[in-house]
Amino acid sequence: FFETNIHSRSYSHIIRNIYNVPKDVFNTIHDTKEIVDMASSVGRYYDELHKVNCRKELGQDVNEKEHIKAIYMALHASYALEAFRFMVSFATSLAMVENKIFIGNGNIISLILQDELLHKGWTAYLINQVVKEDSRFAQVKSECEAEVYQLYLDVIREEKEWADYLFKMGPVIGLNATVLKDFVDYTAVSALKEIGIRYNSPAPKTTPIPWFNKHVDTSKKQTALQENESTNYVIGVMTDSIDYEELPTI
């Protein structure tokens, strides 16, 4: 929750620095069908687990296998979020940095990306470990293989649709919807392999976005502090309201 709060504040900071009236952007988020669809497709697994947990808290009879399955599917939903859901947006934002645009914002996004990759590693460990240590989870795994794989296929398809949505007005230098969709497939191979799943769709053997790696491993980025702003999380350094009298006379 601490990191999530930092991420939320960081994104808010970025939007405030770009738009004069940021609330207009925030207010349209839930009106964007593509965003709502992506949230609901994964969110339903959390909703299902929440319902089962509530029934158990109320003392109602809860089938143990149903509960185990709800936990297992929610873990995979979390992994889908960390491994796939944000990658197209991350790559698009960082492409601007590669074109020397919004560099300060890109540095913040690089930090958030690194956090998400840590979450991905932790979630993969949990998925692999519960199956090893608990025979009930091992049984659910064998029974739900097709459902789990379909979960990932749905998220991957939605990410590709998001790439089309982002670039519906045209490409930016060095990036377009086709490259991004190849990047999603490339990412899927290693991400699914990490949790013991084979990705059966065609995918590039090498990354379609080579520069993305330096944002994952910041030790590969060499920038003197005086040439760029610090990558510490910063909020509230910009304002969209200023009185004319405050401006210096020239």
Question: Where do the protein language model's features map onto the residues?
Answer:
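Non-heme di-metal
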Residues: 1-250
